[in-house]
Amino acid sequence: MLQHTWLPKPPNLTLLSDEVHLWRIPLDQPESQLQDLAATLSSDELARANRFYFPEHRRRFTAGRGILRSILGGYLGVEPGQVKFDYESRGKPILGDRFAESGLLFNLSHSQNLALCAVNYTRQIGIDLEYLRPTSDLESLAKRFFLPREYELLRSLPDEQKQKIFFRYWTCKEAYLKATGDGIAKLEEIEIALTPTEPAKLQTAPAWSLLELVPDDNCVAAVAVAGFGWQPKFWHY
């Protein structure tokens, strides 16, 4: 997988119709920044933040939602606190109120201290991020959630390659399911073709494109986008 260069946001950022903007978001923000971000959240977002048991998780949720508002507000030309969200039946956030007609579509994923956000116009889009954490039952999880040929490929690999391949499969499937709004129950219906040296392709949905990402050491990610012919841009918040 290619390493991409994540650039600082330019002063006058524009999103063209054939672009997908990918944002790398550090969630461990200084306390002063966290307070500013919290001030932009809605009452239901603040209530969600307060339901986290661990303060670290509360802070990271606040940072992720506040920065998402900042990013989307920049494209919409409004203050972060003015951005309105609706939620699909499975809880996927989408733009609501007058912003629903903007054509701006986005998706957010986070793992530990990092989040990724994908934004574009008109194309359905999903993104997933996973840290390569030790998982003792990789093969049993793969047998449950992956197709037989995916499971067999994983089993055939040396032990040191299995973890990364497992999470590459997982992020590609999850990114597509997040884009379509389907739940994790359909993981085993999504076929991904990949090898340790070849990029992933969505066999189940040939009209969709996949891009794998390495946003940080020891993690993998993927973005699924409806259609082809789009250009990725990589920004660091």
From Swiss-Prot:
Chloroplast as UniProt keyword: no
Substrates-to-products reaction catalysed: apo-[peptidyl-carrier protein] + CoA = holo-[peptidyl-carrier protein] + adenosine 3',5'-bisphosphate + H(+)
InterPro entries linked: 4-PPantetheinyl_Trfase_dom, 4-PPantetheinyl_Trfase_dom_sf, AASDHPPT_N, P-Pant_Transferase_HetI-like, P-Pant_transferase_sf
Cofactor: Mg(2+)
Superkingdom of the source species: Bacteria
EC numbers for this chain: 2.7.8.-
Any one Gene Ontology molecular-function term assigned to this protein's record: magnesium ion binding
An example Gene Ontology CC term for this record: cytosol
GO annotation, biological process: lysine biosynthetic process via aminoadipic acid
Enzyme class of the recorded protein, top EC level: transferase
Keyword terms: Magnesium, Metal-binding, Transferase
Gene3D superfamilies: 4'-phosphopantetheinyl transferase domain
Keyword Metal-binding included in the entry's annotation: yes
Chain sites annotated for binding Mg(2+): D128, E130, E174
Role according to the record: Probably activates the acyl carrier protein (ACP) domain of HetM, by transferring the 4'-phosphopantetheinyl moiety of coenzyme A (CoA) to a serine residue. May be required for maintaining vegetative growth and probably acts via HetN to inhibit differentiation.
NCBIfam families in alphabetical order: 4PPT_HetI (NF042922)
Alphabetical list of PANTHER family matching this protein: L-AMINOADIPATE-SEMIALDEHYDE DEHYDROGENASE-PHOSPHOPANTETHEINYL TRANSFERASE, PHOSPHOPANTETHEINE TRANSFERASE
Family classification: Belongs to the P-Pant transferase superfamily. Gsp/Sfp/HetI/AcpT family.
Protein name according to UniProt: 4'-phosphopantetheinyl transferase HetI
Species per Swiss-Prot/TrEMBL record: Nostoc sp. (strain PCC 7120 / SAG 25.82 / UTEX 2576)
